[in-house]
Amino acid sequence: MESSAVVPGTTAPLLPYAYAPLPSSADDARENQSSGGVRWRVCAAVLAASALAVLIVVGLLAGGRVDRGPAGGDVASAAVPAVPMEIPRSRGKDFGVSEKASGAYSADGGFPWSNAMLQWQRTGFHFQPEKHYMNDPNGPVYYGGWYHLFYQYNPKGDSWGNIAWAHAVSKDMVNWRHLPLAMVPDQWYDSNGVLTGSITVLPDGQVILLYTGNTDTLAQVQCLATPADPSDPLLREWIKHPANPILYPPPGIGLKDFRDPLTAWFDHSDNTWRTVIGSKDDDGHAGIILSYKTKDFVNYELMPGNMHRGPDGTGMYECIDLYPVGGNSSEMLGGDDSPDVLFVLKESSDDERHDYYALGRFDAAANIWTPIDQELDLGIGLRYDWGKYYASKSFYDQKKNRRIVWAYIGETDSEQADITKGWANLMTIPRTVELDKKTRTNLIQWPVEELDTLRRNSTDLSGITVDAGSVIRLPLHQGAQIDIEASFQLNSSDVDALTEADVSYNCSTSGAAVRGALGPFGLLVLANGRTEQTAVYFYVSKGVDGALQTHFCHDESRSTQAKDVVNRMIGSIVPVLDGETFSVRVLVDHSIVQSFAMGGRITATSRAYPTEAIYAAAGVYLFNNATGATVTAERLVVYEMASADNHIFTNDDL
């Protein structure tokens, strides 16, 4: 039965929940993990309507402090006491996987999170299991009339370990039904984890699941599984092949550097199926991609050379993806040499924990992928997302003829907080991905159209003008579970009047408090005034050649007052073509802020763990921190978002 509660010391209701309340202490959490469930409805708490007011923004963004009382009451009551924190134990390369701990740490002990605070952090419309730890998306596929999502999951705890493949299905990639675990680490060749892999559906309907097994000695091998009943549209049971493991690391490859087989494709040059596996070359510490061919998915031949070797210093390539974009490209790879078709090669950087991609040409017969721009080679140039986004996996959706990409969003708080709240990590919103037809130098990513079905009440505030050095609070009913569409226009006379070049700005070092003639300007979300806020913004400057350059950034530096949280400033330069306004779509879902700027040419994902800007105190502001320009929000529409309907699968769902 759905329950509700009241924030201690206030009259503001908690969001309704359909799972057990959080434990009162970290010790209780370890003994009896809370189930963490899903939120069923959007928050009913209403922000007090406020008149638009112009305020000086410099102090707000630069970190000016004010005496503060509790936001909406004493939300910190019933807090989990701060206790001495141990330095986080690494869960990464020793296990042959990328680092799985955030590293968040405070020598003074963890922040005393209250249950109400932690309850608020759980998202409403992002995918996550009921409880415990999850990471990489695995084997996304459309099969039997269902979208299937498998993912790395620890069924026994809230940090990395005991990794199995969990499984959920959906009709729309928004509302999900949780199924029993698909595979668990029960064989010597995967006893330390059923790691990342992929699913391939053959033309005759056979379903092939390839995955990396982490053996009893922490060596990485490739394994095969098939459905116990291919006629089951839910693919509920899987059989591991008796020939497992089907692939071992070849000579010269480290035992822990051989993982994540890609969805296979059929190559007509020799009538074989191909897959690739990520690895690294210790000579130069460069990422490499190994290619294999097979006719039966049991016996494989290693193809000579590397499909690609990255620049020195790129390190281990994880979670490789390869697919065509542009022209008449579809789900199948065949080395199409049409000039309109480019091939996206993507890797997840084991060293940096970012997802890089590059555009290039692919000669399947020669087993060579070549970037179209060596300066933007794989691992040193373009990223899928400039924030907390990792281990992405795409699939071709035959139902709607589109490519969809998933990734997971890690935590940036402490492991102690994750244990207390009973869960860690979640999935991004699934995104469509395609070539930017205007630039042909980057991809366009956008939330799947099905997400719009969760939009409810809308507030249209288009036409607001924000003077230089000003901030305006938006009169919204709530600011914790929303979808914002905005486009901004700088006053043309202000742009024309600018004569000095500004080439020093950098998202990761400058932030939203650094003022220039034409920025920063944008939105403050999960904001309560002068104490907590996450900035989503543009910064426009003129180069030495007089051309305008635009940065799109997130500034997390003031997103929380908790000290045991990793906060960053993220973003990069984004192309803005003649006649285009500065546009952005921002999805705010409690502790997640995801942005898609310039139609999806650049994306950024932030984790935010506010201590005060929660529930009714979570506001949204327009800001303009430029010194010499007026900004107009030509379009500004804010949608309240309902929560997704996620629950354990029952026969009523058929």
Curated annotation (Swiss-Prot):
Catalytic residues in the record: D136
GO biological process, one term: carbohydrate metabolic process
EC number(s) stated in the UniProt entry for this protein: 2.4.1.99
Glycosylation sites: N32, N328, N457, N491, N506, N625
Propeptide cleavage-removed residue intervals: 1-106
Domain of life: Eukaryota
Subunit structure: Monomer.
One Pfam short name: Glyco_hydro_32C
Location of this chain's protein in the cell: Vacuole
EC top class named in words: transferase
Organism: Festuca arundinacea (Tall fescue)
Tissue/organ expression: Accumulates at the base of growing leaves.
Function: Transferase involved in fructan biosynthesis that catalyzes the production of 1-kestose (fructose and nystose to a lower extent) from sucrose. Also exhibits some hydrolase activity toward 1-kestose, thus producing fructose and sucrose. A weak fructosyltransferase activity leads to the formation of nystose from 1-kestose.
Protein name from the UniProt record: Sucrose:sucrose 1-fructosyltransferase
Annotated keywords: Glycoprotein, Glycosidase, Glycosyltransferase, Hydrolase, Transferase, Vacuole
GO CC, one annotated term: vacuole
GO molecular function terms noted in the UniProt entry: beta-fructofuranosidase activity; sucrose 1F-fructosyltransferase activity
Reaction catalysis annotation: 2 sucrose = 1(F)-beta-D-fructosylsucrose + D-glucose
Family, as annotated: Belongs to the glycosyl hydrolase 32 family.
UniProt keyword annotation of Transferase present: yes
